[in-house]
Amino acid sequence: MVVFKSTLKLSLFALSLSMMMSGCVLVGLSKNDQSKSLYGINLSHLSLAERKELEEAIYADQQRLTEEKQTLLNMTLTHEIGDHKLQFKPLLARLYASRKYAPLWTDNAAARQLLRDYAAMVASGISKSSATSLETLALVEQQGGLVYDVLLSDILLDYLYYTQNVRSQASNWLYSSAQYQAQQPENDHIQRWLSAVENNQLLDFIQSLAGENHLYRQTIQSLPMFIPTSKESNITQKLAMNAQRLRVIPDFHNGIFVNIPSYKLQYYRDGDLILESRVIVGTNSRRTPVMYSKLSNVVVNPPWNAPIRLINEDLLPKMKADPNYITEHNYSILDNQGNVVDPASIDWESIDNKFPYRVRQAAGDSALGNYKFNMPSSDAIYLHDTPNRGLFNRKNRALSSGCVRVEKSDQLASILLKEAGWTETRKNTVLASKKTTSAPIRSDNPVFLYYVTAWIENGNIVNLPDIYGYDRQINLAEINWDLVKKYLQ
């Protein structure tokens, strides 16, 4: 064992030199029992335990060498550009060393486009670190050279991670007080960037990262006109924040778009607006979620299965207070097997705030009205008709339990059922029968429930009430508006 230990130390020293010079990566030894030697070490006389010990020692030494190499690269980069704050210093140190510190940003148009888009993101106030990166770059812009190139690459990596993840992280970054925190982008995204550099396609690559929604583009383009000369920046930052919400929505070309605070549904086909309708959305305590889905089917004469929360909070107190409430509203009480339960058999006094049964309202006279438009949703959200038509005349229509009530549900159903092969006569016949009938959706009909309270359209500001308080929840960073305006123009 003493001989093995000495051999191991000498061999590790030799391996260290070899690894430092070649940058090789070692594979696991214990999985390759047929190996007779490794870098001059005779393995044939070693037990499995000794081989494992050798593997662990080599791995630890490799890790140490990797860390030392990274430290050396970091020091070299600092020597080249000075001690500037970078969000991705280790990655940039490796990248620029591999390129012998050749610049990546020789395309000035691409650099300007990146800074314009990045400044728009910074203006939203969702990231203090991004705001700091922009200010750091501005300090060295006149100096130019490698330091400017590296800082611009640092900004690109930040923006690249943001653009690749903002759609999936919108609820955290754009609708809550959680700050956006940059992470290293995935390697394939980094390689796309570097490939664009090598193929002189950097401007195209930067432009591909921008949002496609035309209201996003109009808002960003017009934003410099609304940047304040005083500290009164509320509307400017509101516009900038909502522009980022717009960037995750595709342009209005195909599908159903419901902007929750506008209480409006718009249905587009091939770029044409074919239906616009007032809607009712969830209350502040039962919010309609920001979500994306696709319509799956239309149900004519749908029954209504009351959500558990609504049963416990709304229906249960009414059913306990009035024995006739259930029959008057055409409700049925069902057990877990779907069997009808006689309300008279229930010991109402023993039930606290959790009703042990399901509640269903029969088709024809249900809270869903004549139509239900289903779509996959983890929150059991869907579009539907309503018998309470007068509610659509209210200015504040945040009145539902989360689902979206559509005023022109009959017109929407006619459009979708026609695509499913139904005639208007068949639709009316099924309606009159009060029989529940479902028709699958044949065409691709995405549904976007989104929340945007301010944007610029044709040069004019549209400013809506923040009905759910999402604008107020954002933990906004301090913005250098003069700097933002400089790069946005």
Swiss-Prot record:
GO cellular component terms, semicolon-separated: membrane
EC number of this enzyme: 2.-.-.-
Protein location: Membrane
Stored InterPro entries: LD-transpeptidase_YkuD-like, LD_TPept_cat_dom, LD_TPept_scaffold_dom, Transpep_catalytic_dom
CDD domains on file: YkuD_like
GO biological process: cell wall organization; peptidoglycan biosynthetic process; regulation of cell shape
Domain L,D-TPase catalytic: 254-433
Membrane topology: Single-pass membrane protein
Pfam family, one: YkuD
Top enzyme class: transferase
Protein's UniProt name: Putative L,D-transpeptidase HI_1667
Family, similarity comment: Belongs to the YkuD family.
Active-site annotation: 384 (proton donor/acceptor), 403 (nucleophile)
Membrane spanning residue stretches: 10-29
One GO MF term: glycosyltransferase activity
Keywords: Cell shape, Cell wall biogenesis/degradation, Glycosyltransferase, Hydrolase, Membrane, Peptidoglycan synthesis, Transferase, Transmembrane, Transmembrane helix
